[in-house]
Amino acid sequence: MTDILEKIVAVKRQEIAAAIARKPLTAMRADAESRVLTRDFVAALRGKIAAGQPAVIAEIKKSSPSKGVLREDFIPADIAQSYAEHGAACLSVLTDLQFFRGCIDYLKQARASCPLPVLRKDFMLDAYQIYESRACGADAVLLIAAILDDAQMKDLEAIARSLDMAVLVEVHDAPELARALQLKTPLIGINNRNLKTFEVSLDTTLTLMRELPADRLLVCESGIHTRDDVLRMGAAGVNAFLVGEAFMRAPDPGLALAELFATA
């Protein structure tokens, strides 16, 4: 890890320690285990695909390290409703504070305002965060292969599965993909953005998807901005996408989704 990602991880470790000091692991785990009825994230994606529609994980993100503030008029509940009304399969909510100006309350607000399953998008390093995710209502969590070793990925996935949460494991290169395929989750996110440099290329998905077994569901992440991008990926057999920035900059995020993916 280098540069931006290394900084994010260092800050995240401090945040986790502070969170545990405020509320111990045993208490957070009890809260998580008392939650019932997750919304089925994988089924929501598969349902769209089975109907011949693009399965879009629509992201709620106020800011990013590379682009700064994406949306000043930022009301997560309204954005979530707009996404749901315009054909999104699921939501992704950024909860990292320091680098993305997110928070857990944004996830709670988004989930309360619509029926869609919600992914907590953050930098997961510790079991505490998985329990925290379920306690705040998340239906799925993101695991980033670049910041976790094999044992950590398997442990965090096992905890998520024990809480009936889905896991989206994110990769950027062939070695990371090989490691991700050791997990049980069917969801493999190929991030076209290099988290070490924040450079983006859709060729990342087109190259790595050749190594993906048929029983896994590929989610194309980052770099989808135009209808041509969607058509290019669709022609290659990609039918699930995670998109945020393109929608966050639009006056109506849900309408932007419908126009980009022709879901209207």
Curated annotation (Swiss-Prot):
Gene3D superfamilies assigned to the protein according to its UniProt record, in alphabetical order: Aldolase class I
UniProt KW Amino-acid biosynthesis keyword: yes
Keywords noted in UniProt: Amino-acid biosynthesis, Aromatic amino acid biosynthesis, Decarboxylase, Lyase, Tryptophan biosynthesis
Pfam family, any one: IGPS
Enzyme class: lyase
Superkingdom assignment: Bacteria
Cited SUPFAM superfamilies: Ribulose-phoshate binding barrel (SSF51366)
GO molecular function: indole-3-glycerol-phosphate synthase activity; phosphoribosylanthranilate isomerase activity
Membership in a protein family: Belongs to the TrpC family.
HAMAP family, per database record: IGPS_B (MF_00134_B)
Protein name: Indole-3-glycerol phosphate synthase
Gene designation per UniProt: trpC
